[in-house]
């Protein structure tokens, strides 16, 4: 799905992140309205679910972070945000960068 003319296709962003995480498995992508979440990942069906509002209204930087976040869960095979998760995320963003991006996400949602 093309976000808009100025943004990359979601599949392209996902594929870039899969490559950077050295994940050699294919995943499904669903974009749908979600009331409580901006994204989720199902280990059972290998499905990345993205909130339609987020896809349509967030810029590429924020989408990249959200997708990376979910795919790190897939890579480490855990829903937790423990040391393994944090270490993997730090390969891409510093703690300060994460805090700044997460603040932007919150501001876009309120």
From Swiss-Prot:
Report what the protein is called.
Uncharacterized protein MJ0123
Q: Which InterPro entries match?
A: YgjP-like_metallopeptidase
Tell me the superkingdom of the source. Archaea
> Coiled coil located at which positions?
none
Question: So what family is this one in?
Answer: To M.jannaschii MJ1213 and A.aeolicus AA15.
Q: Where are the transmembrane segments?
A: none
Q: Which cysteines are joined by disulfide bonds?
A: none
